[in-house]
């Protein structure tokens, strides 16, 4: 990721599973593992031919899109459909929050600044998800 060129066009996407702690606490880590694998599979099948998918934490992922940038919105819709249509062995559904930044949005000082902006957008998306769903995020 640190080798990305700030003068080229690419997209940085921060993604995070919603409700993983609740799933782990309520049903055990087998269920959490199923959700993490499913989210990764949805990301890979939606984005891999256009860039790379990285797992950067327990339920946190970064996607870097370097090809077909004009098709990015379509890639996101495909990803959202895959997540919405997924049904697991242990859990009925999953939800993933994301935020993204185009490298061309403005003059960035560093990739860290881009990742920070993307994370902030993802956390806003996550906050809205928990407000809409009525779930307590801390549980």
Q: What would you call each of these model-derived segments?
A:
Residues 12, 61, 96-100:
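A structural signal for short, well-ordered beta-strand segments
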Residues 55-56, 83-99, 132-137:
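Catalytic core regions of nucleotide second-messenger enzymes
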Residues 13, 128, 139:
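Active-site core of bacterial EAL-family cyclic-dinucleotide phosphodiesterase domains
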Residues 8, 49, 92-96:
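Residue-level signal for beta-strand positions within conserved beta-sheet cores that form or flank
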């Amino acid at each position: 990721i640190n080798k990305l060129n700030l003068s080229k066009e690419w997209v940085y996407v921060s993604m995070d599973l919603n409700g993983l702690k609740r799933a782990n606490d309520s049903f055990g880590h087998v269920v959490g593992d199923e959700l993490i694998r499913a989210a990764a599979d949805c990301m890979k099948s939606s984005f891999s031919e256009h860039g790379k998918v990285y797992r950067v934490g327990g339920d946190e992922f970064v996607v870097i899109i370097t090809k077909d940038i004009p098709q990015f919105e379509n890639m996101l819709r495909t990803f959202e459909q895959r997540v919405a249509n997924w049904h697991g062995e242990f859990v009925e559904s999953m939800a993933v929050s994301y935020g993204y930044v185009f490298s061309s949005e403005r003059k960035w000082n560093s990739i860290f600044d881009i990742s920070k902006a993307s994370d902030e957008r993802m956390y806003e998306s996550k906050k809205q998800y928990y407000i809409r769903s009525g779930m307590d995020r801390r549980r």
